[in-house]
Amino acid sequence: VTNKPNVFTSLATRLAPRRRFLKAAGSAAAAALTAPAVLTGRAAGPILIGAGEHTYEVTHDWARLPEGRAFGYTHGVIVDGQGRVFIHNQSEDAVSIFDPEGRFVRSWGPEFKGGAHGMQYSREGGDEFLYLSDIGRKQVIKTTLDGEIVWTIGCPMASGVYDDPGKFVPTNTAVAPNGDVYVADGYGQSWVHQFNARAEYIRTWGGKGSEAGRLDCPHGIWIDTRSDAPRVVVADRSNRRLQYFSLDGRHEGFVTDDLRHPCHFDQRGEELLIPDLHGRVTILDRDNRLIVHLGDYEGVEKLKGYPNLPREERPAGRFISPHDACWDAAGNIYVVEWIRDGRVTKLRRAG
């Protein structure tokens, strides 16, 4: 951790039980999920994936754009307080908005064309905001839901870890309960930067590597509130793991099982949702044990042309390259994929 010194007490004692549950997923849970992931009652019927309470009906290409418009790569997705679905995509307008039935509402953000990556939703008091990670402009932009800019963060040169501001390429953000903002430099130098709610720099940690506390493409970041104290969890993608930190950047543990190329997160109650770039979406329980893999397309990343497979080569009920995913209030899941023409899939809860 660079910059401000921090007090961190009795870490080993306080976190011993948590390290145990972070170490590995339960083998019994994993074994129970070896049954086929795609269930079809009849050829013309609905496509169901998952198991038990986590069974979902699949609708690919759920979001319907006006004629003549296209998404480009679909990189981020959130659901707002009205149940509207916001897609962060690399088209003319960076943000496209849909009602709960998949009907197009409006779009905005031509000034962010081509740079759309992560998108984080935050309710702050009575207001709602978006945090957009722009890999083209190498900025994080806080906006209202209508696209009004609140503030912008560029390369944090105060961190002392950059000799060139162009090496900062933010991929995702997380917002803590106190309003602090955590920025993952996933496509840059693999740092995590912490700012306060006014976008003022606080500290930095991480940096490229595989040892504890180091990261290699920290692609996604989240504030995990499922335990007694909120913690930062990072999708340490190229290291194929999740890595946990305290809110002031102290390493706390890993999750290494049941992951291929984790991209980002969403949380609903005691469950954690993880879109995995290599062909599936994963749900973990409170102890980070596997509940289910959804739409698993094992080996898809080895196919010629991945991820831009022609539509006729995209099996129904299988994912190609999930880049982000989120729940709505009813427990339905929306998945966006890293595909040149974009793909938005709705998983309607059926279990």
Locations of regions flagged by a protein language model:
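Blade/loop signatures of beta-propeller domains
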Residues: 41-59
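N-terminal export leaders
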Residues: 17-32
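Surface-exposed loop and turn segments in beta-propeller and other repeat-based domains
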Residues: 60-68, 109-112, 151-164, 202-213, ...
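Blade-loop segments of beta-propeller domains
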Residues: 98-127, 135
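Beta-rich, blade/repeat-based domains predominating
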Residues: 68-82, 112-126, 158-180, 210-231, ...
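Blade-level signature of beta-propeller repeat domains, shared across WD40, Kelch, NHL, RCC1
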Residues: 321-351
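Conserved beta-propeller blade signature
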Residues: 84-86, 129-131, 181-182, 231-233, ...
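N-terminal secretory signal peptides
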Residues: 1-17
